[in-house]
UniProtKB/Swiss-Prot annotation:
Residues 1-22 form the signal peptide. This is Matrix metalloproteinase-20. SMART domains: HX (SM00120), ZnMc (SM00235). It comes from Homo sapiens (Human). Binds 2 Zn(2+) ions per subunit. Binds 2 calcium ions per subunit. Hemopexin repeats lie at residues 293-343, 344-389, 391-439, 440-483.
Length: 483
């Protein structure tokens, strides 16, 4: 891992080139394809393998082919390719990959010394948001990206909501006043300035891009974490597994740990984070497991309830209970992290579509898909379902098998989602108490069993008959786990 060779206003960019990732061999390519690839290579090498004070794009040919061959060899060596000096297919594939725009050679020497922050507590402020994501999602992505670095070094990040912060974060369009204009979708994704006064540390994202916390677009956590590495003083790494490797590669925000190479680099600047051990403890002290909530208390409630295969799962805080529907024995608690490590804790809502063999777990503005207890890919945004942007989380969800529709409860209202059409139905949301006679209070969880909908609201569970359209019985929620 390299640290930046100079302090001051060195700017860095992440780029997604406007070309496909596959490239034919230049030897076998048509004249037009050859010319296009050659121009692309010229532009790439001029941008990433030429001093900033040197020639601009388009001057490389006039300087002779030897200069270009040297730069091709530099590129091949950096990425661990066979060093031939030729624009072969493997080299062109690298050139066409989305990447960070900071050069792979040391170009920025505005001030002597390695740029780093001279204090351990840094402030940050998000001054402008993107329409691609909710403000809650953006806040979370930024927070997690900064935590990735603070976990390794003695730096703390404090968010402020007004005034000038050390790291100013914003989503900008086109020319936004820092001499590094954005160029629209799939061009430059973001840029950040090295530690220092003024623009130092500031990080800008192209507002024209589709930002996401998943994979359907550019993952904000991935780009932000990489850019914050530059904002803290790191240059690129030649280790393909490193966060600071030049090319864009999705990183799952949940459970992310800073790779070893990045840890070495950031600790070279700031030193390791010291762990306060506190008072000595007795040898072999037992590990304290999360306490199991006392759901036999008269005021107990559940966060989420769903079927998963042949079992009924009931969630509360960091614990969930597994039971057979028709048995009151063998009910056992488990920690959420032991079976669903990506969820970590506190599930807001859950439901299963048995015909597909998939279940959906909701937490804040995100949801996860499972097959049994196996997670299927990274988290996705709840706005995939068609929720309006003011909806920040789901309180409860229940899948109705006969109409193949899922009801989502938010506050005192509910939405209806058509699972066959994969589309939110019109004329929703509707008031829950007006539509479900006898059900009172906000819905915490819901599940359909044997033609009945069971609504969990605080310490009560309402058994709702869909044919009679009325509640037929009310029991204590705690009775579901044998209390």
């Amino acid at each position: 891992m390299k640290v930046l060779p100079a302090s001051g206003l060195a700017v860095f960019l992440i780029m997604a080139l406007k070309f496909s990732t596959a490239a034919p061999s230049l030897v076998a390519a048509s004249p037009r394809t050859w010319r296009n690839n050659y121009r692309l290579a010229q532009a790439y090498l001029d941008k990433y393998y030429t001093n900033k004070e040197g020639h601009q794009i388009g001057e490389m040919v006039a300087r002779g082919s030897n200069s270009m061959i040297r730069k091709i060899k530099e590129l091949q060596a950096f990425f661990g390719l066979q060093v031939t000096g030729k624009l072969d297919q493997t080299t062109m594939n690298v050139i066409k990959k989305p990447r960070c725009g900071v050069p792979d050679v040391a170009n920025y020497r505005l001030f002597p010394g390695e740029p780093k922050w001279k204090k351990n507590t840094l402030t940050y402020r998000i001054s402008k948001y993107t329409p691609s994501m909710s403000s809650v999602e953006v806040d979370k992505a930024v927070e997690m990206a900064l935590q990735a670095w603070s976990s390794a070094v003695p730096l703390s990040f404090v968010r402020i909501n007004s005034g000038e912060a050390d790291i100013m974060i914003s989503f900008e369009n086109g020319d936004h006043g820092d001499s590094y204009p954005f160029d629209g979708p799939r061009g430059t994704l973001a840029h950040a300035f090295a530690p220092g006064e003024g623009l130092g540390g500031d990080t800008h994202f192209d507002n024209a891009e589709k930002w996401t916390m998943g994979t359907n677009g550019f993952n904000l956590f991935t780009v932000a974490a990489h850019e914050f590495g530059h904002a803290l003083g790191l240059a690129h790494s030649t280790d393909p597994s490193a966060l600071m490797y030049p090319t864009y590669k999705y990183k799952n925000p949940y459970g992310f740990h800073l790779p070893k190479d990045d840890v070495k680099g950031i600790q070279a600047l700031y030193g390791p984070r010291k762990v306060f051990l506190g008072k000595p403890t007795l040898p072999h002290a037992p590990h304290h497991k999360p306490s199991i909530p006392d759901l036999c208390d008269s005021s107990s409630s559940f966060d989420a309830v769903t079927m998963l295969g042949k079992e009924l799962l009931l969630f509360k805080d960091r614990i969930f209970w597994r039971r057979q529907v028709h048995l009151r024995t063998g009910i056992r608690p488990s920690t959420i992290t032991s079976s669903f490590p990506q969820l970590m804790s506190n599930v807001d809502a859950a439901y299963e579509v048995a015909e597909r063999g998939t279940a959906y777990f909701f937490k804040g503005p995100h949801y996860w898909i499972t097959r049994g207890f196996q997670m299927q890919g990274p988290p996705r945004t709840i706005y995939d379902f068609g929720f309006p942007r003011h909806v920040q989380q789901i309180d409860a969800a229940v899948y109705l098998r006969e109409p193949q529709k899922t009801l989502f409860f938010v506050g005192d209202e509910y939405y209806s989602y058509d699972e066959r059409k994969r589309k939110m139905e019109k004329d929703y949301p509707k008031n829950t108490e007006e539509e479900f006679s006898g059900v009172n209070g906000q819905i915490d969880a819901a599940v359909e069993l044997n033609g009945y909908i069971y609504f969990f609201s605080g310490p009560k569970t309402y058994k709702y008959d869909t044919e009679k359209e009325d509640v037929v019985s009310v029991v204590k929620s705690s009775s579901w786990i044998g209390c």
